[in-house]
Amino acid sequence: MKKLWQNCHIATMQNGQYSYIEDAAIVTEGHLIHWIGKQQQLPTDTYSETVDLNGAWVTPGFIDCHTHSVFGGNRSVEFEKRLQGVSYAEIAASGGGIASTVRATREASEEQLLNSALKRIRCMQQDGVTTIEIKSGYGLNYENERKMLRVIRQIGEKLPMTVKSTCLAAHALPPEYKDQSDAYIEHICTEMLPKLHAEGLVDAVDAFCEHLAFSPAQVERVFKTAQSLGLPVKLHAEQLSSLGGSSLAARYHALSADHLEYMTEDDVKAMAASGTVAVLLPGAFYLLRETQYPPIESLIKHGVRIALSSDLNPGTSPALSLRLMLNMGSTLFRLTPEQALAGVTIHAAQALGLEQTHGSLEQGKVADFVAWDIEHPSEIVYWLGGDLPKRVVQHGQEVIF
């Protein structure tokens, strides 16, 4: 049955621009957009329900394309340490950082991980997020990576959201492989990834390319394994130093390379040539009080698509509002509100390989949208905090919170 959503204005975000339709209407059928356009051009038809959106501005549902939403415990004590002058690298070297979350995650049951993650993700959902990517990477052995990935699949079953699962086994070195990073990479490639993929738990493969994690050569071994399994790749790259990880990601036609504070112009050119999306993570940049900015002007000049994401994680970005990340992306990185909104809609969809079905409001795409009680889409980026009045529609059905 067809449902009519009328009396609205639309920022479709096609081609990464507002692409306005004023005095508009949307017709949904099931979970898809059947028709979209100006109200006066609405085809004559019979509708099972008509919804008055009261002059709202409608945008695509937000896509949070880089999160670590499933984890045990939290790291508020480390937050204090960093404010006392201890660096992220020093915390990691002393057994904190990712290692402390690994311990807490291994100790937690699937049910505990699921319940804590659902609380966080419902906050994101109320902020307008309709699609989310979630990484493993706090288990670091087969049993616990599998546990995390199973929880991610359960989240997709529990919530009316699109949930994409990324295996980030190459996130850090587990304690049982201390000083044996090559052996751990071999274990990931020969044991973990093939088994997890065979169970249908993995949509993409990620790794952390950094001096305190894994080298480009080690990451390439993971990428080759993912490629052999037919899985797309992503990469944490150039967050703390320049190792050429983003160029490596480009060589493997990665969906995205993420963080990118220390990338060079050669890296930018490589990503532009491969179509790899640059995912910027202003929450981590802000919380770590970084001073090295991603090369925004170069990315724009060379036509690299820019996405924004929360990087929701317990250590460096405990961010429960993607809308706040929009403001940070504009304020810290000088993105325009239009560029920021593209970063959590169509460009974020491209970072997940979902651009054919999600990320913009077009006929035939999934009916995920948010109707905002605002006077212009830039307000979504402009207002800091609070809960902007909105109606969230997922797969053609309004979500009641």
UniProtKB/Swiss-Prot annotation:
The catalysed reaction is:
4-imidazolone-5-propanoate + H2O = N-formimidoyl-L-glutamate
Sites where the protein binds Fe(3+) = H66, H68, H236, D311
For the ligand (Zn(2+)), the binding residues are: H66, H68, H236, D311
Cofactor binding description: Binds 1 zinc or iron ion per subunit.
Signal peptide range: none
What InterPro entries does the entry give?
Answer: Amidohydro-rel, HutI, Metal-dep_hydrolase_composite, Metal_Hydrolase
Give the source's domain of life in one word: Bacteria
- Per UniProt, what is one GO molecular function of this protein? zinc ion binding
Q: Pfam families from the xrefs? A: Amidohydro_1 (PF01979)
What is one GO cellular-component annotation here?
cytoplasm
- Assigned keywords, A-Z: Cytoplasm, Histidine metabolism, Hydrolase, Iron, Metal-binding, Zinc
For this UniProt entry, what is the primary localization, expressed as one broad class?
cytoplasm
Q: Which residues bind 4-imidazolone-5-propanoate?
A: R75, Y138, H171, Q239, T316
Stated EC number for the protein is 3.5.2.7
Instruction: Say what the protein does.
Output: Catalyzes the hydrolytic cleavage of the carbon-nitrogen bond in imidazolone-5-propanoate to yield N-formimidoyl-L-glutamate. It is the third step in the universal histidine degradation pathway.
In terms of PANTHER family, this protein maps to:
IMIDAZOLONEPROPIONASE, IMIDAZOLONEPROPIONASE-RELATED
Kindly give the HAMAP family that the UniProt entry links to this protein. HutI (MF_00372)
The entry sums up its family as follows:
Belongs to the metallo-dependent hydrolases superfamily. HutI family.
Question: Can you name this protein?
Answer: Imidazolonepropionase
Species of the source: Acinetobacter baumannii (strain ACICU)
Q: Which gene encodes it?
A: hutI
